[in-house]
Regions:
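Bacterial Sec-dependent N-terminal signal peptides
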Residues: 1-24
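Conserved active-site beta-strand-loop modules that form the wall/rim of enzyme catalytic pockets
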Residues: 9, 227-228, 259-260
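Basic side chains
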Residues: 2-4, 152, 200, 233, ...
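Alpha-helical transmembrane segments and their juxtamembrane interfaces
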Residues: 12-14, 44, 219, 243
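N-terminal hydrophobic targeting/anchoring segments and the immediately downstream early-domain regions
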Residues: 19-184, 241-397
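Divalent metal-binding pocket/active-site signature
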Residues: 149-230, 235-244
Length: 397
């Protein structure tokens, strides 16, 4: 009898705990600053107001199930793609079509006030983040146009950078085939035009995103901007020394600037052992990978195909959720809780951490933070409050 009572007590405690973190999650404004599903919408005709379970990590119904309130949709194409600006507009069109079909579920927002109104109406607040300065094609007028369509941040450089800002890949790799390389005549950092881009973004109230930026570009941005900046999807270099992650002095500089670091879920950025696992996997299936590439598939889609085909093997490579939490905690301990948030990179990454199987699983992050002893106030900041502060601070008054 005593054992039965004890078991009932344990079950009730677990249920109360689940209700507690779920209630906290539901009351917070949950923001994800980086999701790449628009790339698949443009490339493959994916329509994400349908059930895409097993195909993508995201769709409209699953965002709602995961308690997501604000999604920044990445507008991205490779840096060497022709007509990048036209492609950006195609991606934007795909979101606009979903919004038009589902006005009761999702709305495009252009301001902090719009966002709060959408959340109050229980609609997903959607905005764009343009991933890569190459998409403005060296034209400030095109930057203005993308802003008018709802782009509220610009990632100044992707791996293959524009002519006016060097990327982390540029500054780290001497080999163009590795995703970026510097011409011997080209200086690192922002050019004069790059500084004009920063100035124009400050004038518009458009957030400057330093994810993918090279070190010199980062410091040039810090010097040039008059507004708080973001890293829309980056993690911690001291934990995983990957060129895409932020070093301690950069994290401190973002905090001093009043900005925010949105932690990326990419296993390669949060687990120092993942690179070796991935290399071994791709070596094992090299012939199949090469065959896929020869059919004209992009690298991302070729890898995605293999990871899904060999899902059982892929699953053993996934880092635990606790590793993502370690990156969040590292930033908190280094600079305080006011400067960290979530930038998942869902549908831009091929593998996710364990438990984070798709966008329905955001509440498990809240649970992990509750289990770590963080207060409701601090968790609310991490889930979205910190990003909202930066968004509001950038708006032109």
């Amino acid at each position: 009898m005593k054992i039965k009572v004890l078991l009932i007590g344990i079950v009730l405690t677990q249920q109360l705990h689940a209700q507690s973190y779920q209630k906290m999650h539901n009351k917070a404004i949950v923001v994800d600053t980086h999701n790449d599903i628009l790339m698949q919408a443009a490339d493959k005709g994916i329509v994400f107001d349908r059930d895409l379970t097993g195909i993508t990590y995201s769709d409209l119904a699953r965002w709602k199930k995961g308690g997501l309130d604000v999604q920044v949709f990445s507008v991205y194409c490779d840096g060497d793609k022709k007509n990048a600006y036209a492609y950006a507009n195609r991606e934007m069109d795909s979101l606009d079509a979903v919004v038009a079909r589902n006005p009761d579920k999702i709305v495009k927002v252009f301001s902090y006030a719009d966002l709060l109104k959408a959340v109050k109406q229980h609609k997903i607040a959607a905005m764009f983040g343009v991933e890569g300065g190459h998409m403005i094609e060296d034209d400030l007028g095109k930057l203005d146009s993308l802003y008018k369509r709802g782009a509220r941040y610009l990632t100044l450089t992707h791996n293959i950078a524009p002519s006016w800002a060097t990327s982390a890949a540029d500054e780290a790799s001497p080999n163009p085939s590795k995703g970026g390389a510097l011409d011997s005549s080209r200086r690192k950092g922002l050019t004069d035009f790059g500084k004009q881009v920063v100035q124009r973004m400050n004038q518009l109230g458009m957030l400057i995103d330093v994810s993918h930026a090279g070190d010199q570009t980062f410091w040039d941005i810090i010097k040039a901007t008059t507004k708080p900046i973001i890293a829309s999807h980056s993690s911690v270099y001291s934990l995983v020394p990957h060129r895409r992650n932020l070093k301690d002095d950069q994290i401190k500089a973002i905090a001093k600037n009043g900005g925010v670091i949105q932690v990326n879920f990419n296993p390669g950025f949060i687990d120092s052992s993942f690179g070796k696992k991935e290399t071994a996997f791709l070596t094992k299936y090299a012939a199949e990978y090469d065959s896929l590439m020869k059919t004209g598939k992009l690298e991302w889609y070729s890898m995605d195909y293999l990871y899904k085909k060999y899902a059982a093997e892929t699953n053993t490579m996934r880092p635990p959720l606790s590793m993502l939490i370690e990156h969040i905690e590292y930033i908190i301990k280094l600079v305080d809780v006011d400067y960290v948030g979530l930038g998942s990179d869902f549908d831009g990454i091929n593998i996710t951490p364990q438990q984070l199987d798709d966008v329905t699983t955001y509440p498990l992050i809240t649970k992990a933070l509750v289990d770590k002893g963080y207060s409701k106030k601090d968790i609310t900041k991490i889930l979205g409050g910190n990003f909202l502060r930066v968004l509001k601070a950038n708006e032109v008054k």
